[in-house]
């Protein structure tokens, strides 16, 4: 004991004479602790499930949006060889710290994408009433003429009609005859053909006479 009458070591209480805690209170305290802990864990798991469900829904929405975007991009021809320059990984200032993104102040340059245009459709062939007359008379039609037949084949393949007509004008042919392949060849054309045949015959005869 010290000067004030307090024990120097320990509480000075004889623990052998202290009555024990009631067993019912111990059980009640233990039950209350277990119930409180279980409620906390249940609430924590419920909140986690809600967060995970929300994140999963957002991920599904993003995947759906990306699928739609990929489908739209794949439907545009000519984008397979497009490359965007200047896009790379930006360095981070710290390994495990916040990432600092440096945005350049240069204006964005538009990317020109060359999209091939579909070939123009050939104008429908309008039947010409002269076709029946030409077939009945046995005259030469545009489709049977070898000079016009190759241009008609170009139209069927899908070559632009304007380019074909320009080529025909350069060669001295009538480009309007492409619209009427069953029409008879004009008399002037047939006359030129006959003149060329006569010239070739005269040339062959002169060669034989020589």
UniProtKB/Swiss-Prot annotation:
Per the record, a Pfam family?
A: CCDC53
Region Disordered, annotated ranges: 173-210
- Stretches of Acidic residues bias are at 195-204
Sorted keywords for this record are: Coiled coil
Instruction: State the coiled-coil residue ranges.
Output: 49-73
Sorted alphabetically, the Gene Ontology cellular component annotations on this record are:
WASH complex
Q: Name one GO biological process term.
A: exocytosis
Q: Does the keyword Ligase apply?
A: no
State the family it belongs to. Answer: Belongs to the CCDC53 family.
Q: Could you give the subunit structure recorded for this chain? A: Component of the WASH complex.
PANTHER family reported for this sequence? PROTEIN AD-016-RELATED, WASH COMPLEX SUBUNIT 3
> What protein am I looking at?
WASH complex subunit 3
Organism of this sequence: Salmo salar
């Amino acid at each position: 004991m010290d000067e004030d009458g307090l024990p120097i070591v320990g509480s000075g209480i004889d623990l052998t004479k202290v009555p024990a805690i009631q067993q019912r209170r111990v059980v009640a305290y233990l039950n209350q602790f277990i119930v409180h802990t279980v409620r906390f864990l249940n609430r924590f798991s419920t909140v986690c499930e809600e967060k995970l469900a929300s994140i999963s829904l957002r991920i599904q929405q993003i995947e759906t949006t990306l699928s739609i975007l990929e489908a739209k991009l794949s439907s545009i021809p000519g984008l397979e060889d497009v490359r965007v320059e200047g896009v790379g990984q930006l360095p981070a200032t710290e390994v495990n710290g916040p990432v600092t993104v440096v945005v350049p102040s240069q204006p964005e340059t538009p990317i020109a994408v060359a999209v091939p245009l579909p070939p123009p459709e050939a104008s429908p062939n309008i039947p010409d009433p002269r076709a029946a007359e030409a077939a009945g008379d046995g005259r030469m039609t545009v489709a049977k003429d070898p000079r016009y037949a190759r241009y008609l084949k170009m139209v069927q393949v899908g070559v632009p009609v304007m380019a074909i007509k320009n080529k025909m004008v350069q060669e001295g042919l009538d480009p309007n005859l492409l619209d009427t392949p069953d029409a008879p060849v004009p008399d002037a054309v047939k006359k030129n053909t006959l003149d060329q045949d006569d010239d070739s015959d005269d040339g062959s005869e002169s060669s034989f006479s020589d």
